[in-house]
């Protein structure tokens, strides 16, 4: 009987060993198969939200609608927001002396890589006209800070030092005012103001500025009222050239509401929301409401275009872009503030490879993701407008095979300890 029991134990043990061997072989085969499949799969950058960046602001400060972000050559992160103007009464009781919290932070904030607040400034001052509704921020190769504005009378841009010293105003506030003018049907068109897309001096509610170091030229996404890209001398502010969609002469004739079934509009919709230059000196223009990205030479010659989430209506899908930090800038990262995602795009083909994010309030989710920027390590920074009112950092985690079109919310992996 003992021998029978022992034999059964030996058989059982051998079976377990055989099973483990089979499982090991199967696992090895699966791993090799997956590796082979991944080897031929499309690769894309992978990200993970950093829920602890930045650090809390001092003085009970909070952010309003946050509508611009840029990373300077020191890897410092700059944002611009609308502060008190976009805070509800229950959010700013410190200002109204009705409670201890909170107050709107100054409009322009600078953070280091650890999330510490380094500098803060902005607002009305002598010698310049602060925008009614500031919009977009850029730090140029000389360390100067550029901002635009999309308030009703904002037809100018401003340049400051990093410490907030005023340097230059281009354009005159209120230049687009025309008594009796009716409101248009697109975002930014307000009664009493008309477009001036062929104006050689002033703008029409500028969304964003990009400065080309090689030519010392500023590219202006102009804008929420005008329908053009304007290029100016970055020192004098003199406008040198401008163009509309497809390189056409800009035309301020109101467009019908965007309809994806209609032929492509031959002018930009409002707003023209970005105009950024790549390393090979191509200008990528965000036609936000038109759901399209158009590409031009620096002289305004049309090169190509692509649509994204083409059936997106209202505020559109193409809000802002940033280029990857490899030498060829292989990828474009695009903020989509209606569908609440960041798109990862092959820059050469303009093909969308994958997306991450979703609507919501938790880390890694978005509410009105508006602007996007990248640091030297490849980390992404996004800001949110409307009631989003925040900046988020997404850490670059290397390249990975694309296994699905939408990665969802890219939270950090939970610890197994």
What would you call each of these model-derived segments?
Residues 7-417:
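Eukaryotic scaffold repeat domains enriched in small/polar residues
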């Amino acid at each position: 009987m003992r021998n029978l029991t022992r034999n059964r134990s030996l058989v059982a043990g051998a079976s377990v060993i055989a099973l483990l061997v089979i499982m090991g072989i199967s696992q090895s085969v699966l791993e090799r198969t997956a590796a082979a499949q991944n080897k031929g799969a499309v690769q894309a950058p992978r990200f993970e939200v950093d829920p602890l960046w930045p650090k809390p602001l001092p003085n009970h400060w909070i952010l309003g609608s946050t509508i611009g972000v840029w990373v300077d050559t020191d890897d410092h992160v700059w944002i611009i927001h609308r502060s008190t103007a976009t805070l509800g009464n229950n959010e700013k009781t410190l200002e109204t002396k009705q409670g201890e919290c909170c107050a709107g932070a100054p409009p322009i904030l600078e953070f280091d890589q650890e999330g510490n607040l380094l500098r803060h400034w902005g607002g009305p001052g002598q010698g310049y006209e602060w925008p009614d509704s500031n919009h977009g921020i850029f730090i140029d190769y000389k360390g100067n800070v550029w901002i635009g504005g999309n308030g009703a009378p904002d037809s100018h841009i401003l340049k400051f030092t990093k410490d907030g010293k005023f340097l230059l105003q281009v354009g005159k506030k209120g230049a687009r005012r025309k008594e009796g003018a009716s409101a248009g049907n697109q975002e930014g068109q307000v009664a009493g103001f008309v477009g001036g897309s062929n104006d050689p001096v002033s703008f029409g509610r500028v969304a964003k500025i990009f400065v080309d170091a090689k030519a010392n030229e500023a590219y202006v996404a102009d804008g929420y009222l005008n329908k053009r890209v304007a290029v100016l001398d970055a020192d004098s502010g003199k406008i040198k050239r401008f163009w509309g969609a497809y390189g056409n002469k800009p035309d301020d004739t109101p467009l019908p509401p965007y309809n994806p079934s209609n032929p492509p509009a031959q002018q930009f919709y409002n707003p023209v929301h970005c105009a950024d230059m790549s390393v090979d000196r191509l200008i990528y223009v965000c036609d936000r409401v038109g759901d399209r990205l158009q590409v031009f030479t620096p002289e305004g010659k049309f090169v190509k275009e692509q649509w994204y989430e083409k059936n997106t209506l209202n505020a559109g899908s193409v809000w802002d872009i940033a280029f990857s930090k490899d030498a060829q800038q292989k990828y474009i990262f695009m903020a989509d503030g209606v569908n609440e995602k960041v798109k990862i795009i092959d820059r050469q083909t303009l093909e969308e490879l994958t997306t991450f994010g979703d609507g919501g309030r938790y880390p890694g989710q978005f509410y009105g993701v508006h602007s996007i920027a990248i640091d030297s390590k490849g980390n992404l920074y996004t800001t949110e407008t409307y009631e989003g009112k925040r900046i988020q950092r997404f850490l670059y985690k290397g390249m990975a095979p694309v296994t699905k079109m939408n990665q969802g919310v890219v939270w950090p992996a939970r610890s197994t300890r």
